[in-house]
Structure formats: structure tokens, C-alpha cells
From Swiss-Prot:
SUPFAM superfamilies: DNA repair protein MutS, domain I, DNA repair protein MutS, domain II, DNA repair protein MutS, domain III, P-loop containing nucleoside triphosphate hydrolases. Belongs to the DNA mismatch repair MutS family. GO terms for cellular component: cytosol. Pfam families: MutS_I (PF01624), MutS_II (PF05188), MutS_III (PF05192), MutS_IV (PF05190), MutS_V (PF00488). The lineage of its organism: Bacteria, Bacillati, Cyanobacteriota, Cyanophyceae, Synechococcales. Residues 836-845 have a biased composition (Polar residues). It comes from Synechococcus sp. (strain JA-3-3Ab) (Cyanobacteria bacterium Yellowstone A-Prime). One of its GO terms (biological process) is mismatch repair. ATP binds at G641, P642, N643, M644, S645, G646, K647, S648. This protein is involved in the repair of mismatches in DNA. It is possible that it carries out the mismatch recognition step. This protein has a weak ATPase activity. This is DNA mismatch repair protein MutS. Keywords: ATP-binding, DNA damage, DNA repair, DNA-binding, Nucleotide-binding.
Length: 882
């Protein structure tokens, strides 16, 4: 397009659009942000707005779409949520003061990962911007990851190996945007979720931004980090020997510098104005929960509806602040492996439990706090509005009360609140003494500053008040002087102040009145003196608004200079709030403190599923116990029982209790002793993956393979109905082999729920396997689910009885019984492998032992041979002492 064919304003628009080709350009024209050309068509379609046109010069009309500036946040939130980037071009001078074309500049670029506006964020979830650098070798991908939330100041870096680990970290973080250097093989630009051109080997559900490679180069990235944080070495950050993590962090910082020009100004105190120095972590520092485990255990949302209600977080989150809620969510998705850190959290919960009065008063104070984490970055970026600054002042003003409340605290976290930074208290008082308690949200309309703060402001206000009083008295004096009882003083934005007189009295108007407007029932007049007073009021009001704005900006800058200290206090308060919430849950639900051990034990007495228990009337949930991990119990439990008996609930509650314990929480059990886990694996239910063309069984096998390849003896494995997605004998064979491998090779603590009752035979073959069942009570015409887990293996699944309960027609039920009888009669595997006893055999040779028992029970030779084949486990797999 030839710029010469465009109007000057359109030429400027096109020039800016070329600078930001991958963003929607919102161009401020008066009271609207306008979009043109393809951007207009896109926004019109996405937001269902009217598409109009505008004369652009010699090329004629071009597509145009606009949004009111006062509704910017609402529309911007929708576009950002859809994965778009926005370049916001604002007017830098009033239109009536411009000499020629109004000066406009792009003040910021809003991308999914660089949002700081409250309206565009979820209060209790982080909004992460991530950067990845990968080196794909012949063996394994080595990667560096940096991620930050510029609304809270968090900044983390990590380096690892293996594509699977990287994808699991991304799944935990759910970043709003991921930055990649162009060395990944793609051109520059933004790729929205679902884009078929997604970077090779990375999940397609994220927004990717492809960036120039230079800021990600090691020397450039390293220098950026050193200069930004005023360092001579990166050793203090813990990432000196992690080159890929350094590269990712440097690329992330450069992106913020480029897109947030007006927000990322050098801090007077040094460091980055929005991000604290990056913290380095290792994946092995935390309990690893893969995507399937987080989904199957419904940690943050339910499987069916994807809802928050019904998740574990729904039960746990009793925090009083948004920052406490975000902290709790992070802890839940990243449980600890450091027993000392776990103990510190437990100690704080214990102290709060043992002091109900402290807990009550602390809850009230936390209730009065605002989101200090995000408020700190709002003032640091210079974007906090008057109400947000009032909220900051109010929250800082509570710090002395918090310090007094925890004066006798015994735990380190609560004790840290005893030391209050006087500068923050002074700042809080200054804000409260400067700003009115309920200021308007718009910064330029006045009504911000309290009387007595500024002498010049007080003088101007007094002048306006006197002039308005004169105008108010004018109505009375003019009525008396003219003898017109209907005379009134009015005001509107178009004409200013005027004298209103009914048409019937128009003949009595004094000669000095100047007619301004004639309406159906009235005449409107002005006088020179009235206009003089009006001019004085308007001039003074403009000066008042400008002075209030200046005072507010000064105060906001003062608060911004304390942003780092505010973030530090906010981090402590968020942790206290999260633990306060866990203490509240422990009291309300009767949770107990688990004992964390260094061995492999997993002992839970009368454990309960926290979500199911919460959803049932009090006292109706049936608790169950478990002992796992030799020598305290078996390494693998084969769990059998009918459909609907509660096997899946039992599996999930064990996993949830382990996770709760390692995040530092108390647990729903009468007693628990738990050895630290490195990973929790689950395979509970499966569905077709149509997107990749995988059947239910293939999905199941992929998940099972992942467990067998990555689990170790410090892992917890929870498996439900392995092998059910294929033919019966194939499924049984796979289930047998998987259970056998877990018990003999992996030695992970495992619960293996199954309807293949033949697996009960493993108890007689392997000394570290035990059978347990969920029992039912049989009546003449129905069964009652007792939901009790007891030693021993079940020999029936009661599937037909469950079908009757579900409403299957009676002829179907009767025919099913006939077929079942035939199948059981002719199934050699069923006859050959069904366990007839619970005692452990004395023979040390499992193959010989099975043969002897088969013959002694009179099992036909063919069946014994089939059983012998299934039990051909190499003797080397059986340690003498398990």
C-alpha cells in the first residue's frame, strides 16, 4: 500500500502497524479505540461488534471497528483470553492543543502473559509468562525454563532433561504465553492455541510467541541479568552453571523491556521494577505430579465438568486473601520433598490449631487485607488507580496490628510478622492521610485528596466554594430583584450556568439578561457577571484537578519506590494466609498431623477422602486404613471388589493424603505415618484421544508404560482396572504382567485395583503382595455396599447386580445370569487361577509351589499347565528377603 494515498492520520496508523505486525493495534481517537483494515474485521468477528468504515484518503473507505475507551478493560480481557496481543496507542496531548496531527504513541503491548490489570486477571491464579530454550540432542532434549508473573513479581528459573519433564512443568504452570527463540525453526510472530504450526514437540494448547534469537544468546542474556539486578555474578541466584536457564531468563527480560516500555522504567533502588531476582529450583526439590495424576485426583478441577467445586482445592482453600489463595494453589501443585520445610508448615498449622483466639483474630485481620502482591506491582508500574492506592494504604496500616497479634508466636513464619518495616507503616499512614477514603476510579476528575494536605489546593477549593455559594444566592437575589418567582439557576455541560425563566414571564426579563436558548416552556439567559463566576469556577476546577493529579502521582511514585519491600511482606502474609486456611480446614474436618519419615512406609489409619467426605452429611463417610511399603506392609496390594463399592475412592484418598502431607497440610485420617514420595502416579479411567487418533486402550497403555518406565521404589502408584479396554485374556495377561513387574522390579508402593480376580494368586507367589477387598453384604434380592476395605480377595464383581440397580430390563438380567454361568463353567483360566486360600506357601520356588498346589486341589492337567504358564516368573525376580 502506497502511504501517499492515505490521510496523515492513516499514514501514522499504518506506520505503527508495521512496527507491531503480530498485535491488534488499538488507535485512540477521542473517546474510542479504533481498529482498521484486517484488525477491524478480526475484532468485529471475535467480539461481535459492528463493522463500519472510514475514509482513508485516495484509496477510499477502509474497514473500521471501535470500542469505547471507558470499556477498554472489558473488551481487552476478551481478546487476551482468546490469545491475541494488543498494541495500545494513546493520545499524548489534548486534541485542542495539538498543532496539526495529534501526537500518539504505543504506550504498551498487552499479551496474554504480560497482563497486570485486575480486570484481566483471575484473582486466585497466577498469570505466567514463560520462556523456553531447548537443545535437542540424539539422546535427550536438554532445556532451560524461565517463568514470571509480572502482576506479582515472581520469577523462577530451572534447567532439566527430557521432553516429558518439560511438558509436565508446563502443565503445572499453565503459562498464558510461552516465548521461544527463532532458532526453534519458525518465523517471528504469535501462535494462538490450536495453531497447526505449533513448535515441534511442544503441546498445542498454549500461546507461543516466536522471538529474535539474539536476546536468548548466552552472553547477551547473562549481561541482561547482571545489569538488571546490579550483580557481578549469577552465583547468588543459583543459576551460574545453568546456561539454558540463563538464556531463557534473559530472553524473558528483553521481551518485557520491549513490550512494557512505559511500565519497565529503571528502579531508583536498583533491580527490576516488576520482577524480583530470579529464584532457581530443581525438579527433584518437589514431589512430581504428572498431568494424569493432577487430573485423576481432581486437584484443582473435576474431571467431568472441569469445575472448581468438587476439587481438592475447593475443600482446602479457606484463605482470606487472593494472594493466599494463589500460594495455596502453588503448594498443592508442587508439594515438598524437604522434610524440614514440611515440618515448618506443620508447626505453623499446629500453633494456629492450639490457639483458637489467635486464629479468630488473625482471620479477621487477614479479611481486611487486599492483594498486596499485585498492588505492589501496580504501584511499581505506575498504573495503580486511586482506589488501589487507598487499598494499599489500608493494608499497610494493618501491619502493626498483625505484629502485636503474633507477639507471642513460637513458629518462625508467624514470628517474621513481628518485625514491621517503619517505612511501610509510614507509607500506609501517608496514603490514608492524603487520599479520601472513597475516591473516584478515574484519576483526572478530582475528588482524590483530603482537605488540609496542600495549601494551594485548599485555596482553590475555597475559591470554588465561594463562587458556587454566590451562584446559589444569585437565584434568591434575582427573584427578589426581578419579581419573577419561577426564576431558577441551572447548569449543563453544553452551556454552563444559566438563568431559567418560564415563557409566561419572559416579558419581565431585565435588559441586561442575554438570551442563550429558547425552549418550549422556558427561556434561558446569562449575565456577564454569571459567566465571569463560571469562568473562575471552571478555571479553578481545572487547576484543582491538575494539582490533585500531581499530588496523587507523587504519592504513587513514593509507594512504587517501596514495591520490593511490599512484595516481601506480601509473600509472608500470603504464606500465613494459606496456612491459616489449612488450619481452618483441619479444625472443621478433623484432620490430624501426619508423621513424615525417611523410609518407605505408608501407614494410614481410618483415612478419608477429603472431597467425598465434605460432600456427604457429617459422619456418613466410611474410613479405611492401609499399610504399604516393606517392611511395614506389602509393596503391592491387589484390591478387588464390586463395581460401585468404592475402590476408586479408596485409591484416590490414599494419593490425596500423601499429597496433602507433603504440601505441609494436616490429613483426613485418625493417624498417618508417611515416607516421602518422589512421584505419585495414577491410572484411573481412560477415554479416547480423538485428536491423536488413539483408542481408549492405547491411551491406557501409554499411561501404564509411562508409569513402568519412570516409577521407582520411592514412588506411589495407584492403578485402577489395568487391561479392561481389550479382550479378557489379553487384559488379564497384561494386568498380571504389570502387577508382577511393579512388585518385583520397580518395588513402588502400589495399589492395584482390578476385576481380574485371578490376580489374587499373586499373593501366594510373591511375598511383598497382599490381597484386599471392598466388601459387600449380600441379601436375598440385593447387595449392600459397605465401603469397607478388608484383607482377602473377592471372587465376584456383582456386575449383574449393579446392572439391575441401574435399571437394566429383567430379561437382560436373567439372560446375563445364564451367560455368566456358562462362562464360569468353561473358563479354564478362571478355574485354574482362582485362589482357594489365603495362607502363604512354604516353598521357596514359586513355580514348583504353584504346580504342587494345583495338583493337590485336583485341578485338571490342562488347567494346571495354563496356570503354570502364567506363573512362569523367573526365580531371579524373587529376592529371598522382600
Amino acid at each position: 500500500m502506497d502511504p501517499a494515498l492515505l490521510t496523515p492520520m492513516m499514514q501514522h496508523y499504518v506506520e505503527l502497524k508495521r512496527q507491531y505486525p503480530h498485535a491488534i493495534l488499538l488507535y485512540r481517537l477521542g473517546d474510542f479505540y479504533e481498529m482498521f483494515f484486517q484488525d477491524a474485521q478480526l475484532v468485529s468477528r471475535e467480539l461481535e461488534l459492528v463493522l463500519t468504515g472510514r475514509e482513508a484518503g485516495a484509496i477510499g473507505r477502509v474497514p473500521m471497528c471501535g470500542i469505547p475507551y471507558h470499556a477498554f478493560d472489558r473488551y481487552a480481557a476478551q481478546l487476551v483470553a482468546k490469545g491475541y496481543a494488543l498494541a495500545v496507542c494513546d493520545q499524548m496531548e489534548p486534541a485542542d492543543q495539538a498543532k496539526g496531527l495529534v501526537r500518539r504513541e504505543v504506550t504498551r503491548v498487552i499479551t496474554p502473559g504480560t497482563v497486570i490489570e485486575e480486570e484481566l486477571l483471575q484473582a486466585r491464579q497466577n498469570n505466567y509468562l514463560a520462556a523456553i530454550v531447548r537443545l535437542r540432542g540424539s539422546k535427550q532434549t536438554v532445556w532451560g525454563l524461565a517463568y514470571a508473573d509480572i502482576s506479582t513479581g515472581e520469577f523462577w528459573v530451572c534447567q532439566g532433561e527430557g521432553q516429558e519433564q518439560l511438558e509436565q512443568e508446563l502443565a503445572r504452570l499453565q503459562p498464558a504465553e510461552i516465548l521461544l527463540p527463532t532458532e526453534e525453526g519458525l518465523g517471528l510472530g504469535l501462535m494462538r492455541p490450536g495453531d497447526p504450526q505449533a513448535p515441534l514437540g511442544l503441546p498445542g494448547q498454549y500461546t507461543y510467541t516466536l522471538r529474535p534469537a539474539e536476546p536468548f544468546e548466552l552472553a547477551t542474556a547473562r549481561e541482561n541479568l547482571l545489569q538488571t539486578y546490579g550483580l557481578r555474578s549469577l552465583e547468588g541466584l543459583g543459576c551460574e552453571g545453568l546456561p539454558l536457564a540463563i538464556r531463557a531468563a534473559g530472553g524473558l527480560l528483553h521481551y518485557l523491556e520491549e513490550t512494557q516500555k512505559n511500565l519497565v522504567q529503571p528502579s531508583p533502588q536498583g533491580g527490576h521494577p516488576l520482577l524480583r531476582p530470579p529464584r532457581t529450583y530443581q525438579l527433584t526439590d518437589y514431589l512430581i505430579l504428572d498431568t494424569q495424576t493432577r487430573r485423576n485426583l481432581e486437584l484443582t478441577q473435576t474431571i467431568r465438568e472441569g469445575a472448581f467445586v468438587g476439587s481438592l482445592l475447593w475443600v482446602l482453600d479457606r484463605s482470606r486473601t487472593a494472594m493466599g489463595g494463589r500460594t495455596l494453589r502453588r503448594w498443592l501443585l508442587q508439594p515438598l520433598r524437604d522434610p524440614e520445610q514440611i515440618r515448618l508448615r506443620q508447626d505453623t498449622i499446629q500453633e494456629l490449631l492450639e490457639s483458637p483466639s489467635l486464629r479468630t483474630r488473625l482471620g479477621s485481620l487477614l479479611d481486611s487485607l487486599y492483594d498486596l502482591e499485585r498492588l505492589a506491582n501496580r504501584v511499581a508500574s505506575g498504573t495503580a488507580n486511586p482506589r488501589e492506592l487507598v487499598a494499599l494504604g489500608s493494608s499497610l496500616g494493618k501491619l502493626p496490628q498483625l505484629a502485636e497479634l503474633v507477639a507471642e508466636a513460637q513458629t518462625p513464619l508467624l514470628q517474621s510478622l513481628q518485625q514491621v518495616d517503619p517505612a511501610l507503616v509510614d507509607l500506609g499512614h501517608r496514603i490514608e492521610h492524603t487520599l479520601l477514603p472513597s475516591p473516584p476510579p478515574v484519576l483526572t476528575e478530582g475528588g482524590l485528596i483530603r482537605p488540609g494536605v496542600d495549601a494551594e489546593l485548599d485555596r482553590l477549593r475555597q475559591q470554588v466554594e465561594q463562587d458556587r455559594h454566590w451562584i446559589a444566592q444569585l437565584e434568591k437575589t434575582e427573584r427578589e430583584r426581578t419579581g419573577i418567582p419561577t426564576l431558577k439557576v441551572g447548569f449543563n455541560k453544553a452551556f454552563g450556568y444559566y438563568l431559567s425563566i418560564s415563557r409566561a414571564k419572559a416579558q419581565q426579563v431585565p435588559k441586561e439578561y442575554i438570551r442563550k436558548q429558547t425552549l418550549t416552556n422556558e427561556e434561558r439567559f446569562i449575565t456577564p457577571e454569571l459567566k465571569e463566576k463560571e469562568a473562575r469556577i471552571l478555571t479553578a476546577q481545572t487547576e484543582i484537578n491538575q494539582r490533585e493529579y500531581e499530588l496523587f502521582v507523587q504519592l504513587r511514585q513514593e509507594a512504587g519506590s517501596q514495591a520490593a519491600a511490599i512484595r516481601q511482606v506480601a509473600q509472608t502474609l500470603a504464606a500465613v494466609d494459606a496456612l491459616f486456611g489449612l488450619a481452618e480446614v483441619a479444625v472443621q474436618q478433623g484432620y490430624t498431623r501426619p508423621v513424615i519419615t525417611a523410609d518407605r512406609r505408608l501407614i494410614i489409619e481410618e483415612g478419608r477422602h477429603p472431597v467425598v467426605e465434605k460432600s456427604l452429611p457429617q459422619g456418613l463417610f466410611v474410613p479405611n486404613s492401609v499399610r504399604l511399603g516393606s517392611p511395614h506392609g506389602p509393596d503391592l496390594i491387589v484390591l478387588t471388589g464390586p463395581n460401585m463399592s468404592g475402590k476408586s475412592t479408596y485409591l484416590r484418598q490414599i494419593g490425596l493424603i500423601q499429597i496433602l502431607a507433603q504440601m505441609g497440610s494436616f490429613v483426613p485420617a485418625r493417624r498417618a505415618e508417611l515416607g516421602l514420595c518422589d512421584r505419585v502416579f495414577t491410572r484411573i479411567g481412560a477415554v479416547d484421544d480423538l485428536a491423536t487418533g488413539q483408542s481408549t486402550f492405547m491411551v491406557e497403555m501409554n499411561e501404564t508404560a509411562n508409569i513402568l518406565n519412570h516409577a521407582g521404589e520411592r514412588s506411589l502408584v495407584l492403578l485402577d482396572e489395568i487391561g479392561r479396554g481389550t479382550a479378557t485374556f489379553d487384559g488379564l495377561s497384561i494386568a498380571w504382567a504389570v502387577a508382577e513387574y511393579l512388585a518385583t522390579q520397580v518395588r513402588a508402593r502400589t495399589i492395584f485395583a482390578t476385576h481380574y480376580h485371578e490376580l489374587n494368586q499373586l499373593e501366594t507367589l510373591l511375598p511383598n503382595v497382599a490381597n484386599f477387598q471392598v466388601v459387600v453384604k449380600e441379601l436375598r434380592d440385593r447387595i449392600i455396599f459397605l465401603h469397607q476395605v478388608q484383607p482377602g480377595g473377592a471372587d465376584r464383581s456383582y456386575g449383574i447386580e449393579v446392572g439391575r440397580m441401574a435399571g437394566l430390563p429383567q430379561p437382560v438380567i436373567e439372560r446375563a445370569k445364564q451367560v455368566l454361568a456358562l462362562v464360569e463353567q468353561h473358563s479354564r483360566i478362571g478355574l485354574g487361577l482362582r485362589s482357594q486360600g489365603k495362607s502363604r506357601p512354604s516353598s521357596n520356588n514359586p513355580k514348583k509351589r504353584f504346580k504342587q498346589e494345583s495338583n493337590s486341589r485336583g485341578i485338571p492337567d490342562c488347567d494346571a499347565k495354563a496356570g503354570d504358564q502364567l506363573s512362569l516368573i523367573p526365580t531371579s525376580l524373587y529376592p529371598e528377603e522382600l
